[in-house]
From Swiss-Prot:
One of its GO terms (cellular component) is chloroplast. It comes from the Eukaryota. Binds 1 [2Fe-2S] cluster. Residues 3-33 form the 2Fe-2S ferredoxin-type domain. This is Ferredoxin. It is found in: Plastid, Chloroplast. Belongs to the 2Fe2S plant-type ferredoxin family. The keyword Amino-acid biosynthesis does not apply. Its cofactor is [2Fe-2S] cluster. Ferredoxins are iron-sulfur proteins that transfer electrons in a wide variety of metabolic reactions. Its main location: plastid. GO terms for molecular function: 2 iron, 2 sulfur cluster binding; metal ion binding. It comes from Porphyridium aerugineum (Red microalga). Keywords: 2Fe-2S, Chloroplast, Electron transport, Iron, Iron-sulfur, Metal-binding, Plastid, Transport.
Length: 33
């Protein structure tokens, strides 16, 4: 599976997170880990 860097950015919530995610993993599932 390919690997992607996924950035979750929300200035309102003060969130700026970069996670590694595979294309066979749902983004929400990866963010919860």
């Amino acid at each position: 599976a390919k690997k992607y860097k996924v950035r979750l950015l929300s200035e309102a919530e003060g969130i700026d997170v970069t996670i590694d995610s595979a294309d066979d993993v749902y983004i929400l599932d990866a963010a919860e880990e």
